[in-house]
Amino acid sequence: MKNSDVLQLADDMKLEAVPAYNTTPGRDKFHPKGRDNGYILTLGGTRIYIAGDTEDIPELNQVKDIDIAFLPVNQPYTMTPEQAIRATQIIKPHILYPYHYGNTDINKVKEGLKNEKTTEVRIRALQ
């Protein structure tokens, strides 16, 4: 799939490819614009956003009505905690699972979103 492709998998199951890329100068070589995807999976009435390796890109403004978001937090390849906070504030998911965070202090994301009443941050050790 390429950016903006939509695949109807079943009557109640759809997969949308959304852009995923780096914007930080010097890091854009890791994930150049136009090459990689994140995905929105719709299962019945539930929308799940899996961002892929990306930063807080302008296209996030088109990511709407998300129930569960998976955002990567691990510079130099993905978002900083501050970028993940901004991305969450744009997307406004009901539930956020930060992932791909390695040695990043992921509690910065939870702390930065503590006043966001519409999003529950769930930190899990994802293998």
Over which residues does each language-model region extend?
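Core dinuclear metal-dependent hydrolase active-site scaffold
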Residues: 1-64, 124-127
